[in-house]
Curated annotation (Swiss-Prot):
Protein name: 2,3-bisphosphoglycerate-independent phosphoglycerate mutase
Keyword Transmembrane: no
Cofactor: Mn(2+)
Residues given in the record as substrate binding sites: 123, 153-154, 185, 191, 261-264, 336
Upper classification of the organism: Bacteria, Bacillati, Bacillota, Bacilli, Bacillales
Length: 510
């Protein structure tokens, strides 16, 4: 097949759901979408959970959706990547972890593990801590100390006790590990250069300074009695019977920071890894020759080893089109412009050769329910001029409305948003067809399909419903088990282009 131009049209936040109540997609008058759906081959795609590299059951979002679509493969997010490595056993063979453990065995020193002790799944997951304890046991590391950062933000504000009880039970079961300090994340995980907070955590871990308690649960009990919840627990030291700290970080020790999200892990990591650190005076007991491990790549400014190194996304659709000398256009309004450029290109800022970009300003309104059409008409007018000029072989287009207005949790404006997009969709697709081209009409995740719950409450979050895909080419059959990663291979199939090995998605065309 060799169709040109091929337009990949992403209706942001537009998924399919049988229940019409609270469903702006179902209730909207959308003659163009319905016409294409009835006339052309169509299917539903999974756009959530493990199909897009997230934990099972987790709703997709625009960043993840565009990453997967543009990459033509499942792009595993950090949480899922680590979970999978534990499940498949690679975690326990990770060279960086083993280096840290060998370091302390050779030096006769201690392994310190710190991070956010919860299952919030935003910055960390307690299961990753458990896996590290299991690994320490396997590797026969004798002295393992945990410095627990307490959450209270991505989980309940007073939930720390349940996590600490579970952790104590896990350490007892394995016969490995001891809690040495506890810190509210407000201190240990600051990201705004409030170094006085980070210093309190540092001094607890290195100097054994701070409120002292004989057990972790005493820290929690005392904090709650003083109306201090998990996030704000003052960095506290757990002591032995003789009043000495259970452990402090010393020369030749190793540290593993098990948070996977970088932003709140950078500052604490800089304290221990950077020779020219200027945030505060680390004092003469600054530990030397510490083997420091970051779970993921935190920042160029952190001089530690990385256990799960970044995966470079080579041969995304944009790069493949450039290599095969196809001209491409990326077009969206402000709200979704980064998605059709940076995220679609696998985290690359600069355009590929032969790639043109058009940014249309989003309207300046407080909230988009006040202007549900947003800038869809302006995007469409600009695109129709481009199609008429025959400049591009491939067009990547995003209509932001169903998602951005859907976030309002207001049904009527979201219906209007879907109707405006449908009007624009008709103009664009008909112009593409008139040029002898083909359109792939799809979405990145759900939202407008459930704006109000069955109980009548506003629903502002994304949904896990499947998204549509229509290929405007009669006589084709589409697979029913597709995912977002299959869209780029489908575009290449329509163009008659070659699919690279890195793209593990499969064309939807049977």
């Amino acid at each position: 097949m060799s169709k040109k131009p091929v337009a990949l049209i992403i209706l942001d936040g537009f998924a399919m759901r049988d229940e019409a109540k609270g469903n702006a997609v179902a209730q909207a008058n959308k003659p163009n979408f319905d016409r294409y759906w009835n006339q052309y081959p169509h299917a539903l795609l999974k756009a959530d959970g493990e199909a897009v590299g997230l934990p099972e059951g987790q709703m997709g979002n625009s960043e993840v959706g565009h990453l997967n679509i543009g990459a033509g493969r499942i792009v595993y997010q950090s949480l899922t990547r680590v979970n999978l490595s534990i499940r498949e056993g690679e975690f326990f063979e990770n060279e960086t972890f083993l280096n840290a453990m060998n370091h302390v065995k050779e030096k006769g020193s201690s392994l310190h593990i710190y991070g956010l002790v919860s299952d919030g799944g935003i910055h960390s997951h307690i299961n990753h801590l458990y896996a590290l304890l299991e690994l320490a046991k396997r590797e026969q590391v004798e002295r393992v100390y945990i410095h627990g950062f307490l959450d209270g933000r991505d989980v309940g504000p007073t939930s720390a006790e349940s996590y600490l009880v579970d952790l104590e039970a896990k350490m007892k079961e394995l016969g490995v590990g001891e809690l040495a300090t506890l810190h509210g994340r407000y201190y240990a995980m600051d990201r705004d250069k409030r170094w006085d907070r980070v210093e309190k955590s540092y001094r607890a871990m290195v100097y054994g300074e701070g409120p002292a308690y004989s057990s972790a649960l005493d820290v929690i009990k005392d904090s709650y009695e003083n109306s201090i919840h998990d996030e704000f627990v003052i960095p506290s030291v757990i002591t032995n019977e003789d009043g000495s700290p259970v452990a402090t970080i010393e020369d030749d020790d190793a540290i593993i920071f098990f948070n996977f999200r970088p932003d709140r892990a950078i500052q604490m990591s800089q304290v221990f890894t950077n020779k020219d650190f200027r945030g505060f005076d680390r004092g003469e007991k600054l530990p030397q020759n510490v083997y420091y491990v970051c779970l993921t790549h935190f920042s160029e400014t952190v001089q530690g080893d990385v256990a799960f190194k970044p995966t470079n996304l080579d041969n995304t659709l944009g790069e493949v089109l450039a290599q095969q000398n196809y001209k491409q256009l990326r077009i969206a309004e402000t709200e979704k412009y980064p998605h059709v450029t940076f995220f679609f290109s696998g985290g690359r800022e600069e355009p590929f050769p032969g790639e043109e970009r058009i940014l249309i300003d989003s309207p300046k309104v407080a909230t988009y329910d006040l202007k549900p059409e947003m800038s869809a008409y302006e995007v469409t007018d600009a695109l129709l001029n481009e199609i008429e000029a025959d400049k591009h072989d491939v067009i990547i287009l995003n209509f932001a409305n169903p998602d951005m207005v859907g976030h309002s949790g207001m049904l009527e404006p979201t219906i209007k948003a879907v109707e405006a997009v449908d009007e624009c969709l008709g103009k664009v697709v008909d112009a593409i067809l008139a040029k002898g081209g083909a359109a792939v009409i799809t979405a990145d995740h759900g939202n407008a399909d459930e704006v109000v719950t069955l109980e009548g409450k506003p629903m502002t979050a994304h949904t896990t419903n499947k998204v549509p895909v229509i290929v405007t080419e009669e006589g084709l059959n589409l697979r029913e088990d597709g995912i977002l990663a299959d869209l780029s291979p489908t575009v290449l199939d329509l163009l008659g282009g070659k699919q690279p090995a890195e793209m593990t998605g499969k064309t939807l065309i049977k």
